[in-house]
Amino acid sequence: MRSNLSVGLDAGKALAVAWDVPVIGVHHMQAHALTPRLVSALEYRSSSGPDFPFLSALVSGGHSMLIESTGLADHKILATTGDIALGDCLDKAARAILPSHLAVPPYGRALEQFAFPAGASDYNYTAPAKRDAELARRVTKWGWGLGAPLAGSKNGSSSRKMVYSFSGLLSSIERFVKYEYDHQNSTISSQLRQPGELSDDERRDMAKEVMRVAFEHLASRVLLHLSSLPPAEAAKVKSVVVSGGVAANCFLRHVMRAFLDIRGYSHVELFFPPVELCTDNAAMIGWAGIEMWEAGWRSQLSVRPIKTWSMDPSASDGGILGVEGWLKV
C-alpha cells in the first residue's frame, strides 16, 4: 500500500510543480469523516454540515473507530478495535456463511443481500431498550445464539470499555457453521456438519444475526460515550457521522437509527454518505484537500507517505497537523 501511495503522491507533486500550484496532503480517515460535508456542498446547502462538534463511526475493512471531531484537524479517538475491523469480520463471516455460488466479492454486500433478499421489509428488527437486553444472548430456533462482544467478561467489566472487538463474534459464527449443535447439552459439539446439512434458512439466520450483533456493538459505544457526558456537553452533540465501506450497509443504517431512538437520542441526526461515497473514493480526498486549503494549510514538496498516522492531536505523532511538512499561509 505504501508503494502505491508513493506513486500517487509523487505524481501529484509533479503536477503541482508543472502547474505551479500548491500540493496538500490528506489523511485518509479524515477524508471519510468529512465526506458528509462534501455531500452538503454538492447539494448546495447553505451550511456544509454536519457542524462541529460531531461524532464519527469510521468503519471499513481495515478500520473501526469512534472519533469526536471538534475541528477540521481535531479528531479525538474515543474507541478503536482491539483486534479486527468490522468490515474484515463481515467479509470473513460471509465467506463462511454464504453458499459457495454466492460467496463472491464484495463479500459484505453479498452477505447483506443474502440475509435480506426483499430489502428493508425483511429486517423485522427491534432495538434493545435497555442495556441488559443489549448484552443478552438471543438463542435462535436452531439452538445457537451469538453473544454481544465483550459481554462475557468477568462481572461484565469489559462490556463498558470504550473498545471494539469483533474477533470473538467471527470465531463463534465460524464454529456454528463448522460444527453440529448439541441440543441436549445446549452447546456446540465436536461433530463436524455433513456436506449439505446447513440449510439456506439457517445460513440466512446466521447472516442476520452476525450483522445485528456487530452493528449493535458499534452503536453501543456511541451510547456509552453520550451517556458519559455531562448533560450540557451531551446536548452539544447533535450529529453522528457513519462513514467507510461498511456504512454502505442499509441494515447498519436501520440499526443505528433504531438504537439511538429507543435509548433517548432521537434528536441526534445520523449522517450517512451516499453508497458510492462510502467506500474509498477520489472525491472525498479532494474535498478534504479543499477544506484544508480553505483553512490555510499547504504541504511542502518534501512530504512522503506515512505508514502510521494518527488523527488524534494527543497521540505521540501529534495527529494530523503534528507530522512534518505542513505550511500555514
Residue ranges and their predicted role:
Residues 34, 56-58, 64-68:
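Short beta-strand scaffold segments in enzyme catalytic cores
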Residues 17, 21, 26-54:
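Conserved phosphate-binding catalytic cores of ATP/NTP-utilizing and phosphoryl-transfer enzymes
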Residues 292-329:
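Acidic, glycine/GT-rich loop-and beta-edge segments that sit at the periphery of enzyme/chaperone cores
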Residues 25-26, 256-285, 299-303:
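Conserved phosphate-binding/catalytic loops in two-lobed NTP-binding clefts
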Residues 1, 15, 60, 239-249:
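Glycine-rich beta-strand-to-loop/alpha-helix junction loops that act as flexible
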Residues 1-12:
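Short beta-strand-loop/turn "lid" adjacent to the catalytic site in phosphate-handling enzymes
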Residues 70-129, 166-181:
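Glycine-rich phosphate-binding loop plus the immediately following alpha-helix
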Residues 113-240, 249-261, 321-322, 327-329:
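A contiguous, well-structured pocket-lining segment that forms one wall/lid of small-molecule binding clefts
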